Amino acid sequence: MRSFASDNNSGVHPAIMEALTRANRDHALGYGDDLWTEEAVRKIKETFVADCEPLFVFNGTGSNVIALQLMTRPYNSILCAETAHIYVDECGSPVKMTGCQIRPIATPDGKLTPQLITPYLHGFADQHHSQPGAIYLSECTELGTIYTPDELKAITSLAHQYGMRVHMDGARIANACASLGLSLRALTVDCGIDVLSFGGTKNGLMMGECVIVFDDSLKSEARFIRKQSAQLASKMRYLSCQFTAYLTDELWLKNATHANAMAKRLADALEQVPGVRFTQKVESNQLFLTMPRAETDRMLQTYFFYFWNEEADEIRLVTSFDTMEEDIDTFIRILKK
């Protein structure tokens, strides 16, 4: 049964499986010196910007800690929303790997703003204080909300004014692009993002992410940081070949568009159910809502999904590229019984 617990629970898109099968037919050089990786790098440069530096890694936490290590020193602090993945869901890995203090900022919707960030921009040049060095943001956010280009530009402009850099966790950036009708470049390079964690695992890939470095001053150290962070794959082609397929014929966009459409269908149906209340706008493929606890407990007997805030009876439902209309219709039918 397909669940609504997480897009990490979804399968692998057939086009990605085909790419993996093709990459498996013969031997190839290791550590990224293969034709599959060369082609994937070319695709990424075509998609984002020609002079970017792509680095394929195993997972999202690995991509985040590499990006943050690149742009900070241990005496820096990293600013993020209090719901940020690096603060809540990475077991302290960013702190361990960077040595930096992480400073969470309260937000109503998971989105940072210059107004929320500015009170944390102090202590510069004071040896007694951690020096603000980086801003971490997620697109889409952990609450399913989406930054517009203007909102991103406002944050990167503020950060660069203070000599800081901005890292975007793009685990679900495809869903943001699909929702806004924008290209990957329009939400990253054109907005002044310094380093991107380009995700695909939640949108049809089997595994792997890609750290994409846009800031010229960070590129020379990137490969060394990846190796030190235990994220250099010997059989790199099995990571990289997926991204070639992912970026071919806009598979990334088609998958995300479908996931978003299924989220809207689910949201529209839930709005007609008495007792359901949404706690965040549904802008991507994540839904946050409350309903009577008895109904939640009953649905958990059939479906697997997560509490987001158990004290408030708030749950999260997530659609995927492989969510079907009948999955939603069945869920709603059981809920209405």
What are these model-derived regions, one by one?
Residues 2-280, 284-290, 295-302, 309-313, ...:
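Conserved PLP-enzyme active-site core in the AAT-like
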